[in-house]
Amino acid sequence: MSGNNMLKIGIPKGSLEEATVNLFARSGWKIRKHHRNYFPEINDPELTARLCRVQEIPRYLEDGVLDVGLTGKDWLLETGADVVTVSDLVYSKVSNRPARWVLAVAGDSPYVRPEDLAGCTIATELLGVTRRYFEDAGIPVKVQYSWGATEAKVVEGLADAIVEVTETGTTIKAHGLRIIAEVLLTNTVLIAGKAAWADPWKRAKIEQIDLLLQGALRADSLVGLKMNVPAHNLDAVLDQLPSLNSPTVAGLRDSTWYAVEIVVENDLVRDLIPRLRAAGAEGIIEYSLNKVI
């Protein structure tokens, strides 16, 4: 295989690592990590993977060290890297929802609006984005870099407020902090280096990866339902069915019965199945989906 037919992909190390490896597994790529090794195996001879800090992946793509990778929209904005955003992949450490960078203060502080922090010190890992947020709002503050344990900075009296990322807000509340504003909504993005995107083979491979990752993410919120329905109840059952497309209806060997199959939102199932049963469906089977393209 020529070197041109090898795609170098950056897998985020840290909080997104497990969720990303699981997503690739559902998409058809098994990533096998080795202890203290930043070059995991992947079951595709056309891919070579590297574990990288999510903050560094945009620069590695810009410099051509990697061809494609996954990072956060937040770090793409922070670095200002000149790369191609292929797609949004809305998943995170614990959910398939975007995360938020929020402005938080001590629960008993007098600050209720960002404007109240004029002249104060803000601690954050997201320096550039935070500075631009306050500059755009015309609020003079001192923004300091936090090397970690950012929530503790206010508690320890090292900062008046923090800008920190959260999915649920639980950790921030646990530290006795109160959110007063949202600075940035962020999610995982698939990005490509410009040279890789301009290469026809690499672009096709990147688009293949994107298609299957998107399909696996979409499947997370969906389930399939199969059921048998007597002919005299068919219309009543079909009236209950939402679907991505029209449900599949096929006559069984016994011409008085039909097999019906649909794909529905997972959140609807607990209410839908009893209604289908009441409408006359029998032998209802629910099954999970791996990908929905």
Curated annotation (Swiss-Prot):
**GO MF annotations, alphabetized:** ATP binding; ATP phosphoribosyltransferase activity; magnesium ion binding
Cofactor(s) the record lists: Mg(2+)
Signal peptide extent: none
Q: Pathway involvement?
A: Amino-acid biosynthesis; L-histidine biosynthesis; L-histidine from 5-phospho-alpha-D-ribose 1-diphosphate: step 1/9
Q: Where in the cell is it found?
A: Cytoplasm
Q: Which family does it belong to?
A: Belongs to the ATP phosphoribosyltransferase family. Long subfamily.
Q: What is this protein called in UniProt?
A: ATP phosphoribosyltransferase
Q: Which HAMAP family match?
A: HisG_Long
Please provide, in alphabetical order, the Gene Ontology terms of the cellular component aspect for this entry: cytoplasm
Q: What reaction does this catalyse?
A: 1-(5-phospho-beta-D-ribosyl)-ATP + diphosphate = 5-phospho-alpha-D-ribose 1-diphosphate + ATP
Query: Pfam families of this UniProt entry?
Result: HisG, HisG_C
Disulfide feature? none
What is the activity regulation entry? Feedback inhibited by histidine.
Q: Which domain of life is it from?
A: Bacteria
Print the keywords alphabetically: Amino-acid biosynthesis, ATP-binding, Cytoplasm, Glycosyltransferase, Histidine biosynthesis, Magnesium, Metal-binding, Nucleotide-binding, Transferase
What is its biological role? Catalyzes the condensation of ATP and 5-phosphoribose 1-diphosphate to form N'-(5'-phosphoribosyl)-ATP (PR-ATP). Has a crucial role in the pathway because the rate of histidine biosynthesis seems to be controlled primarily by regulation of HisG enzymatic activity.
Q: Which GO terms describe its biological process?
A: L-histidine biosynthetic process
The enzyme's E.C. designation: 2.4.2.17
What is the protein's major site of localization?
A: cytoplasm
PROSITE patterns in alphabetical order: ATP_P_PHORIBOSYLTR (PS01316)
Query: What organism does the record attribute this protein to?
Result: Nitratidesulfovibrio vulgaris (strain DSM 19637 / Miyazaki F) (Desulfovibrio vulgaris)
Please list the coiled coil stretches.
none
